[in-house]
Amino acid sequence: MSAASPLRWQLIEHAPLRALNTFHVDATARWLLNIHAPEALPDALAAPQIAGQPLLVLGSGSNVLLAGDPPGCVLCFDNRDITIIAHHADHAIVRAGAGVNWHGLVMYSLQQGLSGLENLALIPGTVGACPIQNIGAYGAQVSDFIHVVEAYDRGTEQFVRLNPAECAFGYRDSVFKQQPDRYLIVAVEFNLPLLHELRLDYAGIRDELARMGAELAGAADVAQAVINIRQRKLPDPEVLGNAGSFFKNPLLPSEQIAALQASFADMPVFPGEQPGQGKLSAAWLIEQCGWKGKREGDAGISEAHALVLVNHGSASGAQLLAFARQVAESVRERYSVILEPEPRVIGAHW
């Protein structure tokens, strides 16, 4: 059964979600709402079948673990327009709809001679999801280049434009993550420079550029280097179900870092997000506990990267969650460090 407003939105009952999450776990949405025109949101949300129901927004399902059927309604945005809305001498403002593929936007920006997003190449997901997690990789995070987030405020039932301060961005955090039931992101505007200082001092980017023979590297070269590295390290979700890095790198006070280094001298430590803080490598902690490449049934940790929780075939979301909890518990027991998941866990508590 389905209901629709022609070309604007569509409501589908009892929709399977296996194809809408990159772990490829089975789950069913009581209602699936496809939004083709964001301005139709108020009308669509007032549909009697879903009015007042909980909402789960799914982009490509690359940052979620469905440990059970989501309650209420699952919402997907299908607006995939990209527009350069302002040109300036040294930068441009690019607007992308929530349904735009993230990597597609990165490559589009590079083709337009714009930089800034190159270190974030090949991150799975959609533009609408990127501010929620404040996606980051290889020394960059998307909040550095967000100009405005356009959203529908379910509390006031109004469309709003939020600047970066109002988005309350932090490490893998934002107001959208802190208040998941309030805002529905419909588009994002990016402030992208024509030229900016390239971030090369992270995770082998310089070495990869050297292998590529890119002596005078530009933003497009950095993007290709990142793509090469990610393709070597991270399994393709179409081949092996996963959501990329499953665990956050722990941020700890400097005093706790020093105490850990006194006991584990080879423990790698990176600068934190704030003074008096350091960042540990969750991958290192997990590998030291012997989990890299380990599996129980079809739930496991990738052989190539210890941060990546994988579904080898038919693991359920609940089985993947239980396995991830075992990993986190072993790290806590050995290092007294608490690991937290990057993806949002639906249908169960972490």
From Swiss-Prot:
Source organism of this protein record: Xanthomonas campestris pv. campestris (strain ATCC 33913 / DSM 3586 / NCPPB 528 / LMG 568 / P 25)
PROSITE patterns according to UniProt: FAD_PCMH
Pathway: Cell wall biogenesis; peptidoglycan biosynthesis
Subcellular location: Cytoplasm
NCBIfam families cross-referenced by the UniProt entry: murB, PRK00046.1, PRK13903.1
This protein's GO CC annotations: cytosol
HAMAP family recorded: MurB
Gene this protein is translated from: murB
Assigned EC number: 1.3.1.98
FAD-binding PCMH-type domain location: 24-195
Assigned protein family: Belongs to the MurB family.
Names of the cofactor(s): FAD
Active-site residues, Swiss-Prot/TrEMBL: R172, S245, E342
InterPro entries, sorted: FAD-bd_PCMH (IPR016166), FAD-bd_PCMH-like_sf (IPR036318), FAD-bd_PCMH_sub1 (IPR016167), FAD-bd_PCMH_sub2 (IPR016169), MurB (IPR003170), MurB_C (IPR011601), MurB_C_sf (IPR036635), Oxid_FAD_bind_N (IPR006094)
SUPFAM superfamilies in alphabetical order: FAD-binding/transporter-associated domain-like, Uridine diphospho-N-Acetylenolpyruvylglucosamine reductase, MurB, C-terminal domain
Listed PANTHER family: UDP-N-ACETYLENOLPYRUVOYLGLUCOSAMINE REDUCTASE (PTHR21071:SF4)
Keywords noted in UniProt: Cell cycle, Cell division, Cell shape, Cell wall biogenesis/degradation, Cytoplasm, FAD, Flavoprotein, NADP, Oxidoreductase, Peptidoglycan synthesis
GO biological process, one term: cell division
Swiss-Prot/TrEMBL catalytic activity: UDP-N-acetyl-alpha-D-muramate + NADP(+) = UDP-N-acetyl-3-O-(1-carboxyvinyl)-alpha-D-glucosamine + NADPH + H(+)
Known function: Cell wall formation.
Listed name of the protein: UDP-N-acetylenolpyruvoylglucosamine reductase
Main EC class the enzyme belongs to: oxidoreductase
GO molecular function terms attached to this record: FAD binding; flavin adenine dinucleotide binding; UDP-N-acetylmuramate dehydrogenase activity
